[in-house]
Amino acid sequence: MAGQTQQNSVGELVEESSLSEYRRALSLVERLHRQLLDVVKDDLDRAGHDDLTPVQALLIFNIGDAEWSAGELKSRGFYLGSNVSYNLKKLHELGYVESGKSLHDKRQIRLRLTQAGSDLRRQLDTMFQRHAATLSPVGGVESPDLVSSNKTLTRLERFWADQIRFRL
């Protein structure tokens, strides 16, 4: 049934195969996100880190060696959840993140990892390095596959951001 079209809610014609592939991509992105959280959770559990959620661990990973404000973490795409303040407060209470006033703007709070946060980040980085080393021999995913996937996912991310920004 190639070439069949369907009319969307604004009267535009959408090729059925494009719609089907787009829906498949949506489902896959959602499943991959959940699977990543499960993989991180499994690694946390093995290391005895039952005090953290996978979202909090990824937030630690993304903070890295830099100092950030909560707003910067969100605006740069490192954290897209609505409860960034809750998670940062929790990480602060657990001793993974410390905060201090910005040198340039005393109203702004800057966040950085503590030694415990840096140790956890190294653990996560080791896991990601292990994944990267086995991606080809075990997963059958080569570097050019990742380059192509990353280009497509970046375009999709930009497309969705534009949907919100320009109310398309």
Can you say where each PLM-predicted feature lies in the sequence?
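Alpha-helical linker/hinge and terminal dimerization helices associated
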Residues: 32, 36-39, 43, 77, ...
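Amphipathic, non-membrane alpha-helical segments in soluble helical-bundle scaffolds
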Residues: 19-30, 81, 121, 143-146
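DNA-binding alpha-helical recognition surfaces that contact promoter or target DNA
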Residues: 86
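Charged, amphipathic alpha-helical coiled-coil/dimerization segments
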Residues: 8-11, 89-148
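N-terminal leader segment of winged-helix/HTH proteins
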Residues: 1-50
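Generic structural concept
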Residues: 30-33, 60, 64-67, 114, ...
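C-terminal regulatory/oligomerization modules of transcriptional regulators
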Residues: 1-18, 141-168
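N-terminal helix-turn-helix DNA-binding core of bacterial DNA-binding proteins
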Residues: 38-83
